[in-house]
Curated annotation (Swiss-Prot):
PROSITE patterns: COPPER_AMINE_OXID_1, COPPER_AMINE_OXID_2. The active site is at 323 (proton acceptor), 408 (schiff-base intermediate with substrate). Glycans are attached at residues 154, 568. Mn(2+) binds at residues 473, 475, 602-603. Topaquinone (TPQ) is generated by copper-dependent autoxidation of a specific tyrosyl residue. It comes from Arabidopsis thaliana (Mouse-ear cress). Belongs to the copper/topaquinone oxidase family. This is Primary amine oxidase 2. Its EC number is 1.4.3.21. Disulfide bonds join 342-368. Transmembrane segments: none annotated. It catalyses: a primary methyl amine + O2 + H2O = an aldehyde + H2O2 + NH4(+). Pfam families: Cu_amine_oxid, Cu_amine_oxidN2, Cu_amine_oxidN3. Its cofactor is Cu cation; Mn(2+); L-topaquinone.
Amino acid sequence: MSQLLLFTILVFSSVFVIGSLSFIPPPHPFDPLTEIELNLVRNIINERYPIGLEHRFTFQYVGLNEPDKSLVLSWVSSQYHNVKSPPRQAFVIARDHGKTREIVVDFASQAIVSEKIHVGNGYPMLTIDEQQATSELVLKFKPFRDSIRRRGLNVSEVVVTTSTMGWFGEAKPERLIKKRPFYLNGSVNTYLRPIEGMTIIVNLDQMKVTKFRDRFTSPLPNAKGTEFRISKLKPPFGPSLQNAVLFQSEGPGFKIDGHTNRWANWEFHMSFDVRAGLVISLASIFDMDVNKYRQVLYKGHLSEIFVPYMDPSEDWYFRTFFDCGEFGCGQYAVSLEPYTDCPGNAAFMDGVFASQDGTPIKITNVMCIFEKYAGDIMWRHTEIEIPGLKVRPDVSLVVRMVTTVGNYDYIVDYEFKPSGSIKIGVGLTGVLEVKPVKYVNTSEIKEDDIHGTIVADNTIGVNHDHFVTYRLDLDIDGTDNSFVRSELVTKRTPKSVNTPRKSYWTTKRLKAEELLVVNPSRKTKHGNEVGYRLLHGPASEGPLLAQDDYPQIRAAFTNYNVWITPYNNTEVWASGLYADRSQGDDTLAVWSQRNRKIEKTDIVMWYTVGFHHVPCQEDFPTMPTLFGGFELRPTNFFEQNPDLKTKPIKLNTTPTCTARND
């Protein structure tokens, strides 16, 4: 670290400790809140409300208050950012004596500038602290301990996790959660040894167990076969894989300045939010023909992950999780491991969020950035009559985050290509949610439907869905965009055309609500509207729940893969600002019923990647990664192939590989 930088940090810290009238905000309006800012928010609010669980005032969410978009774009477009930066503020959701408060803190004035009490349905996302506190509460609860002993189990080997309650028609549901016990005793794979048949409900505002019942139902699955640690597994082992390393003799091709990344012809900003996790903003691509960067994506991030299970029994019907809105996809983001989660050429960045009492918590290596080359071809061509060929390797830049919400791990990738494409992918791995049964073979099953698959002795992997919804504020060459669809239709060849062909297909443009975002005010030299096309990838299934089923009412945003809404900085979370125990009255599906203009205006695309997961034995004890995603691909955005003038990669030495003869 340079002496100048070190001195700046020391002075900066000293200013904060003394009293931060000279508080200096981060250089970029989209930079995530820093540890200093989070501490400042805590101190400012603490002057009005005593903080801490004993005072019943807790921070449920602290994030950057969305700055005015016009001010951000004005700041970005100024050559040296010499216009005034948008006001920097924090948005806080807190619980205070059974009420939900929304507070806005302004850093310039170091004061609360807005405050109101939420009076609608739903509750804010759970904190890690209150989940841990309720687990300890249950473990000390005498009726629970007695039940564990009556089952012949050791209380010290029991762990307790949290499930949200969902909503099933209650007029004004309380802030309750369900707690679920699991048994270790020979396994670290917690979720594969559920202690089924217990109903444990905890009131979060009162911090007490309000309902307990033990029905002593199913047997406990055996610990055998649940191990996944290589150090504990026994031979024979699988094939040895050679380490595949991308060697960059001249170093990485990207440059990170603060939270801004510049690579090839791309420039974009990376941030972190406790609910969304990784956030990509202000993605622009350089166009050589006009010698400037052109806008593509103003902001993109995870909005929600809806995971409903398909077992209607008492122990399972409520398992209809909203991972981002109830638990926080950023709150449960994990530290990435170099060389395994990310390749050896990756750079890493940390993330920070506020704990329940407002103090900062750092997640080291919460995101990684790396150049990816898997042997794919960017473009190539061979002319038979002309010696030689032209080919370019397909190198891309990936920004990655992994969030582990309960038993599932989600690998979230944003992949930028020199062609102008942005590929957004999500990988599902981790551990199944399982149900203990008396069966060990399908021949023993008596019921019509066991709601899953026998994956091990006395163990059913329960059928479920994953719906991963993204919010994508696309600004294709500006903010005045429209959404259209190009439909393929069959047309008979006119007899007047001298050809032996009888048919062909062409495009017929319809104004609709899927597949293509264009800017009607920007056209190519040949008159085509500049745009970006949405290409569906693997996993684009829709919901199969009845639309009047309570979970689907709350998750009606999954009814379609694609939604288009006009830009509104309050419409960020597809499940609503308050997802826990919500009633579906403030979701993307509700906003879309307002019938607002989506032509030649600032619009937002919402896309849902959908998986129907019928578990199989290969998913046990850990699940091989299953990928889905989609691509945003330039369509008449450029005058020609932007990769055409990409220079070939020069190799200083030619690598040689020979097959092993073992």
